[in-house]
Amino acid sequence: MYMKKPAIPDDVIERVQQGKCTKEDALLLLEGNPFELFELANKLRASTVGDVVSYVVNRNIYITNKCVGTCGFCAYRTDEGYILSIEEILKQTEEAREAGAVEVCVQGGYTPEADMEFYLEIIEAIKSGFPDICIHALSPMEVNYAAGLSGMSVEDALRKLKKCGLDSLTGTSAEILSDRVRKIICPGKITTQQWVDTVTAAHRAGISTNSTIMYGHVETLEERLDHVFTIREIQKETGGISELIPMSFLPYNNPIGEKMMASGKFTSTGLEDLQLIAISRIILHTHVNNIQATWVKLGKKLAQFALQCGANDLGGTLMEDQISTASGGSYGEYVSPAEFEWMIKGAGRVPIQRDTLYRKVEPRLPASEGLLPGYVKPKMGSKE
């Protein structure tokens, strides 16, 4: 027999509305009726950003798949891979610009060939050639590794990146901000405190960041929540975080996922995905305004439904996503502006295009134009 769960207590709602949700509140909300959780998150979304849903016309540029990391969730890295030349990077940026992009997201593995001078040259070349393109690049891990190779401090590296034209640092390499979890899934990566220190140093240097959480593997529910509360604490200190992107773990073609599936455990369910989006909106209310439902992880239909659960952004056109595809992602690598508009309007919302920093931009091309799904990806870069 179905037992109706009690309504959300008034004192919890009051704390949430004040931006003071506690961990105990969050656990209580997750134990309750999920549809009441979604409704609360949706109301907070409406009061914060209204009925506007944003997306960005962008392109991922994967500069290298070489990596000395030992992350157990990664199927992307190879010992013998490619490194794009400056010319290849600029060519891909030009293709993106011609397709109406306002952002390039530059990412890859970390490798001894890529010191800080390597990244500074890339950032400067892109900004010089395409000053109207936002450069969203490097992770806190890459900054730490490359700065170490070049014998400079993280703070100096960030100042140089800012001077060369970096607009935003990616909030990836966060995974789960728990050292217990990190020792299992990415033992060679920076610690939780190093990640926090790098992000706050970026904000002090005038560089915005987003934030991410990669969940659905070995972490506990409380560790997920602790992660989101850590993001809140950073934001209270610096105000430099533009968004949170919850990313569900893809368990295919990687050691962590294979071990999970062999034991009968799979990644997060659709309900868990929506609950995390909702509770993130609730915890971060009055602090981080933007919660993304990333279609490349959730699929287009679940991402659209997440707009009823606290999300207000659908991410980017991407044009390619080698990392998700390598780990079994099956939702494609490109969504056209026209399809984003259709998804958003179908949810009863108002679509807008934005840039990296969540500033509204006028479309550079009509939504019906630009790069179409028949787009042929360029070949990978030159072998080293």
Curated annotation (Swiss-Prot):
[4Fe-4S] cluster binds at C67, C71, C74. Consists of two subunits, CofG and CofH. Residues 53-286 form the Radical SAM core domain. It catalyses: 5-amino-6-(D-ribitylamino)uracil + L-tyrosine + S-adenosyl-L-methionine = 5-amino-5-(4-hydroxybenzyl)-6-(D-ribitylimino)-5,6-dihydrouracil + 2-iminoacetate + 5'-deoxyadenosine + L-methionine + H(+). NCBIfam families: CofH family radical SAM protein, F420_cofH, PRK07360.1. This is 5-amino-6-(D-ribitylamino)uracil--L-tyrosine 4-hydroxyphenyl transferase 2. The keyword Transferase applies. Pathway: Cofactor biosynthesis; coenzyme F0 biosynthesis. The keyword Nucleotide-binding does not apply. Keywords: 4Fe-4S, Iron, Iron-sulfur, Metal-binding, S-adenosyl-L-methionine, Transferase. The lineage of its organism: Archaea, Methanobacteriati, Methanobacteriota, Stenosarchaea group, Methanomicrobia.
